[in-house]
Amino acid sequence: MNDSVNFRSFKKGDYEVCCEWWKWWWKSSGQDPVIRAFLPKDERCFIIEKNGVPVACYFLFIMEPSIVGWTTYLVSNPQYNERDRREIIKLLVTNVEKEAEKIGIMQLFTVCGNQQMSNIHESLDWMLIPVKNEAFKYLTNNFKK
């Protein structure tokens, strides 16, 4: 069977899926899912799927002026336990970087939230700064425009 990985922006029902994931991941803290109004519009909310199964979501905020972006609230499917989980999450981050480059973003910031996310971002050439779990990356292709 050929595996199909699909990266896309949100469609109806995706926010509710993320809420279920946040509830699972944040159950020990008692934190509520992110309120929809705090997230960007659907075209800046991204999801990656494998064989039709949602694996993870990531959100891109664009600052004004629109050369700086902020990615946040990366959440993954707690039921997806395949060996390629980390690689699919890395692909999600990479694809969101590409979306940011398309619209002229030159630098991305994120708060990684935990060591696994820090490791993933660092492996993708994000520069980790000496504040716990924060990282940024210059999207240098946009410096040449």
Question: For the regions a protein language model found, what residue spans apply to each?
Answer:
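Acyl-donor binding region in acyl/amide transferases
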Residues: 69-125
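Conserved beta-strand in the GNAT
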Residues: 47, 53-62, 68-72
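Short alpha-helical
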Residues: 13-17, 66, 115-116
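Active-site rim helix/loop that mediates acceptor-substrate recognition in acyltransferases
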Residues: 22-51
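Conserved catalytic-core motifs of GNAT/GCN5-like acyltransferases
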Residues: 111, 127-142
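Charged, low-complexity C-terminal accessory regions
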Residues: 58-59, 142-145
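Short amphipathic alpha-helix that is part of the acyltransferase structural core
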Residues: 1-33, 132, 145
